[in-house]
Amino acid sequence: MLKNYAVTIAISSIAAFFLLYFLFAYSGIMLSVESGYQIGEISRWCERISSGYFREPSNALSNIGFILTGIFMVWILSREEVTGQNFFIGFTSISVLYASASIFLGPGSLMMHGTHTVWGQWIDNVSMVAYIIIPWLLNFKILNGWSENQFLAAYFFILISFSVLSWFFGSELGIDFSLFGLSTVSYTHLRAHETELH
């Protein structure tokens, strides 16, 4: 069963990420400096830009916290029994998706702060959207009686659409639209509406 290997899969995925990161960084293929900045200057994220494997070492490596939190979630979920009422107890598709999105936040942000590349910024935005749309869509699932398959279909449709569109048109999709901002505002309004219903 997959849940017996979940922690091993999560740790192996992160180990592969760091191995590839260091191989590409060592080869010089993927490191850059954000436009308008130079090595030794202070970045817009308040850290001096380094010439090492991580352009912003503290900002990049602080994302290990997301990775460890996600792996810890996977470890707990793989040991719990599914209750049927709470989507976040036991090894359910939604709980695993949430833990995976937490893990993904780490490499996503690390790529931005570590590489200073346009695609590093892109994957950072994708990882944030991957995480924030889960509670947003979960409220739609609850309020509209969606099945898990409907929830997952909507999630991956939004995430893939955002990923492709933001690659070609930027994170505001070329129309000054912030899916991340919309997600946080919509989530707040949905929670307020849900509270009124109870």
Show the residue positions of the predicted features.
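Early transmembrane hairpin module of multi-pass membrane proteins
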Residues: L2-I175
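Alpha-helical transmembrane segments and their membrane-interface exit regions
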Residues: A130-W136, S183-L190
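Single conserved hydrophobic/aromatic residue that forms the stacking wall/gate
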Residues: H189-A192, E196-H198
